[in-house]
Regions:
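Active-site neighborhood of thiol-dependent amide/isopeptide-bond enzymes
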Residues: 52-113, 117
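Secondary-structure boundary elements
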Residues: 1-74
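Enriched - but not universal
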Residues: 15, 31, 52-54, 58, ...
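Loop/turn elements at helix/coil->beta-strand transitions in domains of secreted/extracellular proteins
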Residues: 38-44, 91-98, 119-122
Length: 215
């Protein structure tokens, strides 16, 4: 009979690995941003980098639920894991990111919607399918913009139909999805993690930071 061996990691080893993961993600975020200073263009660069580096799980390989940095090192993951990597990158480059999966009624697919904060509002993007919507002024659509979906146009690589329903259907409840959204990014940053431990900052669980500005 196989025996389970438990490795008890000493505190110094935990701290060292925590620091290494933080440093890795800062380096990846800097590389992915490519020096771009405009927030919208930078976010789209981060989307492109994530999709180029993290591919869908190869056929025959299992889904592995582990640390965000391991997803990048492994170079594959599912839709939620791509969303985790992307929102971690946006958080590290100054725009807080969160995500949650949503499947509209009648759809045979789901979309991991990513929410990226910009000046008190939240852009909405779909990393797995490479899609988002734009306003008439050419800006990435925010949660508030989806109150008038007829004014928006589909951009990126996402199809017009997905899972048997119009692609826009996956964005029909963005405010509700946002209220359930979460992030693990800030929890791997040393300063934020310390504040969480001593209770001065909430954990990055669902709805931890449901901030919406009225239009």
């Amino acid at each position: 009979m196989d025996r389970m061996v438990v490795h008890r990691m000493p505190l110094w080893e935990k701290a060292a690995k925590f620091y290494i993961r933080d440093k890795e993600f800062r380096q990846w975020a800097e590389e992915a941003a490519g020096g771009e200073t405009d927030p919208q263009r930078r976010v789209l660069r981060l989307m492109e980098w994530t999709r180029n580096v993290v591919k869908p799980i190869p056929s025959g390989l299992p889904f592995i639920d582990d640390h965000i940095s391991h997803i990048v090192l492994r170079h594959y993951g599912n839709d939620g894991q791509l969303a985790e990597v992307f929102t971690a990158l946006t958080t590290y480059t100054g725009n807080e990111g969160r995500w949650e999966a949503y499947s509209p009624p009648g759809a045979s697919a789901r979309v991991a919607l990513c929410f990226v904060e910009s000046e008190g509002k939240w852009w909405v993007l779909d990393i797995w399918n490479g899609g988002w919507f734009e306003t008439p002024s050419g800006q990435i659509a925010t949660i508030e913009d989806f109150k008038h979906p007829e004014r928006l146009r589909r951009r990126g690589q996402a199809p017009e139909l997905l899972g048997g329903v119009p692609y826009i259907s996956y964005f029909q409840d963005v405010q509700g999805v946002f209220m359930r959204s979460f992030s693990r990014a800030r929890g791997q940053m040393p300063w934020h993690r310390f504040l969480m431990i001593i209770g001065l900052e909430p954990e990055d669980g669902p709805g931890a930071y449901p901030r919406l500005r009225n239009p």
